[in-house]
Swiss-Prot record:
Signal peptide: none annotated. Pfam families: KRTAP (PF11759). One of its GO terms (cellular component) is cytosol. Interacts with hair keratins. The lineage of its organism: Eukaryota, Metazoa, Chordata, Craniata, Vertebrata. In the hair cortex, hair keratin intermediate filaments are embedded in an interfilamentous matrix, consisting of hair keratin-associated proteins (KRTAP), which are essential for the formation of a rigid and resistant hair shaft through their extensive disulfide bond cross-linking with abundant cysteine residues of hair keratins. The matrix proteins include the high-sulfur and high-glycine-tyrosine keratins. It comes from Homo sapiens (Human). Belongs to the KRTAP type 19 family. Keywords: Keratin, Repeat. This is Keratin-associated protein 19-4.
Length: 84
């Protein structure tokens, strides 16, 4: 199963992937109408983020072949960094 960890200003997600193609999305950065999402391709552990929020930033990491503790650490840091 793929794992997706991301954070945006205001809101952060840590989601499990779907099947072999892991993907997820996060919304935040000022309002719920402003979305950012990240996709990952199963097998190579690559992820990217396209934040559409103005004045903000975000990143996404798709972890497929990394240990569980690394995944939980990324997700934990994500929520800590976006705590308001």
């Amino acid at each position: 199963m793929s794992y997706y960890g991301s954070y945006y200003r205001g809101l952060g997600y840590g989601c499990g992937g779907f099947g072999g193609l892991g993907y997820g999305y996060g919304c935040g950065c000022g309002s719920f109408r402003r979305l950012g999402y990240g996709c990952g391709f199963g097998g190579n552990g690559y992820g990217y983020c396209r934040p559409s929020c103005y004045g903000g930033y975000g990143f996404s990491i798709l972890l497929k072949s990394y240990p569980e503790d690394t995944i939980s650490e990324v997700i934990r840091r994500s929520f800590n960094l976006t705590k308001y």
